[in-house]
Structures are given as C-alpha cells and as structure tokens.
Amino acid sequence: VTDEEAYKFVNRLASMGHESPIEHVSFTFAVEGVSRSLTHQLVRHRIASYSQQSQRYVKIAQFEYVVPPAIANDVIASKLYIQAMEEAQEAYNNIYDRLLVKKAIELGIYSKYTAYINEKLFDKFRATKIIETYNCGENPEVIKNESELMTLDEFWREYDKELPRNERMYSKTQKTIIEDVRYIYPNACETKICITMNARTLLNFFHHRCCDRAQWEIRELANEMCRLVKEVAPAIFSKAGPNCVCGPCPEGVMSCGKVKEMREKFLI
C-alpha cells in the first residue's frame, strides 16, 4: 500500500465517522516543564496511559515551578508569587526536619554509638575520624592499655551491628515523612509525565484542548502535540484540532468567534 493509498483510505474512514481502526495506532509523548495543575486536567482524558514523576519517595531540595504569563508580566504579582513558592519550600524543609527528628527519637534510631558517629546522616567518614583520634596527629599515640583496645573493639562491633539497621530505618522513615510533607507543594509545582494515547483519543483530546477556551497551559501542550502528530501521520491528523476546524463551534454564546483563524491555523 502506497502512502497515497493509505491517505485516501484513512480519509474515507474518517469521512464516514468510522474511527475505530485508528485506535490501533498509538503515540507516546515525554513532557516536562509543566505544572501539576496541567496534569490534573490531563488525566481526565481516561483512555490513555500516564507515568508521572513521583513526589512520594524523593525529597526535593528546591522544587521548580511554572509561572503563569499573566503573573510573570506583572512585576508586583511576580514578586509575590515567587515569595509564595519560596515560603512553600521553606515550610516543606522545616516540617520535614521536625518530623524526621521526632520519628528518629521515637524509633530509637540514634543509639549509643550511632548518635555519636552521625549528627544527621550515617556517614562512615566520621567513624574513620574517631579512629584517627587514637593514632593520628603530629605525635601519634599508641593505645595505652587493653581497656582502650576493648573500647575500640566494642565500638566497631556496635557500629557494624547498628549502622545497617539504622540506615534501613532511617530510609523508611524518610519515605514516610515525605509522603506527608509533599501535601505542602502547590499546583504550580513543575513535573514530568509520559503520555501514551491512541490516535482516536488524541483527536478527541485536540477537539477539547486546542480550543481557545481551554486553559492556557494545557492548550499550549495540546497545540504542540497536534503539530508533532501532523508531521508524522498527516493522513490521520490532517484535520485535527478544535471542534470548529471541521464543523460548527459547540461553545455557543461562549465561542471565541475565530472559526476562520482556527481553520487556517490547524488545517493542513
């Protein structure tokens, strides 16, 4: 089958309203730099597969965020917005630290020796430094008596026994706390998401989200996705776009009134 024959066949199916065959064609998009506000809207399109960056197990040192154009173009609004984002991160860090210390004490993570070895993390470098206090320096000291040697041996036995246990408990505790403190993050928080949709679902997605009445961020995403699929599969997507591209605008009195402009923009 030539490309021309395939194009005619797909167009004939589309003109008959017979779209089920194109459900066998799927497209995958890797999307980044978008807000969680966008992804909340995106997953309403249910006949699709999504894999989104998780906030559940990874502590974010400084979250990235999306700034809406209307805010970015206003100096005072932009300043207030950035301040709110920084305050959200500060609250995240403070609550995380507080809950971590509280939970660590409750679980007894910091035992007799590990509390001395580490102030915050389980750093083996600190353990080495303890040994250096015995035998290093300008005038290395020889261990003076058997009691000191026994203390040193006891330290290593305790260290070898407690460190793995504490590391496991510490890691588990971190994950539990992150699950709670992530509630602080706003919808503006930047995320990454992988999307797979079949061609029929994409056409429906474009009908709703390429419309000028769609929210600006998801509209920008839909327009870019539409542009990309038109390049690789013009036979399927030559008439893809908002509803008004191939028919009357369904928005009624809420219509943007730009049917002509929209058709010029989307029709190949």
Named regions from a protein language model:
Residues V1-I268:
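Family-specific signature for flavin-dependent thymidylate synthase
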